[in-house]
């Protein structure tokens, strides 16, 4: 299987998942604990980038997407989301209460207000998702 991880990084992650300490892994692999630490750190960075890439892909292919600005009251978001869905002809399989609950549990909000800019989107499998606002200019079709 193709992956972004090296064979050594995979070994380190597998052993960590089994509960081994970095020093124990170093002995098993015949390397230093510092090297194991670096391998693990770089593997986790690659995993984070892969997750972000997948989230970005889902966002690009989303059915409905709305931008939320810092300071916006989350109680106003469902109506905004439903209006956007209606505009593009998509039925949202969530109620207002479900969207608000999702935002409280997953979005960067505090006391009903967005702490930073983010997007709420409905992915290709009808799941609500939170993502970062894309700073890429929209591509204009000729």
UniProtKB/Swiss-Prot annotation:
Keywords: DNA-binding, Transcription, Transcription regulation. GO terms for molecular function: DNA binding; DNA-binding transcription factor activity. One of its GO terms (biological process) is DNA-templated transcription initiation. The keyword Cell membrane does not apply. InterPro entries: RNA_pol_sigma70_r4, Tfx_C, Tfx_DNA-bd_arc, Tfx_DNA-bd_euryarc, Tfx_DNA-bd_sf_arc. The keyword DNA damage does not apply. HAMAP family: HTH_type_Tfx (MF_00620). Belongs to the Tfx family. Putative transcriptional regulator. This is Putative transcriptional regulatory protein PF0535.
């Amino acid at each position: 299987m193709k992956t972004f991880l090296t064979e050594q990084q995979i070994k380190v992650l597998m052993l960590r998942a089994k509960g081994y300490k970095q020093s124990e892994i170093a002995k098993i692999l015949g390397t230093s604990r510092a090297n194991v630490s670096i391998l693990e750190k770089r593997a986790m960075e690659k995993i984070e980038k892969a997750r972000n890439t997948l989230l970005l892909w889902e966002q690009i292919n989303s059915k409905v997407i709305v931008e939320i600005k810092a300071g916006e009251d989350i109680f106003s978001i469902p109506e905004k989301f439903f209006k956007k869905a209606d505009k593009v002809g998509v039925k949202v399989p969530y109620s207002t209460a479900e969207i608000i609950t999702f935002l409280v549990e997953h979005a960067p909000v505090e006391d009903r207000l967005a702490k930073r800019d983010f997007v709420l989107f409905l992915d290709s499998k009808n799941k609500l998702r939170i993502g970062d606002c894309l700073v890429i200019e929209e591509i204009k079709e000729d």
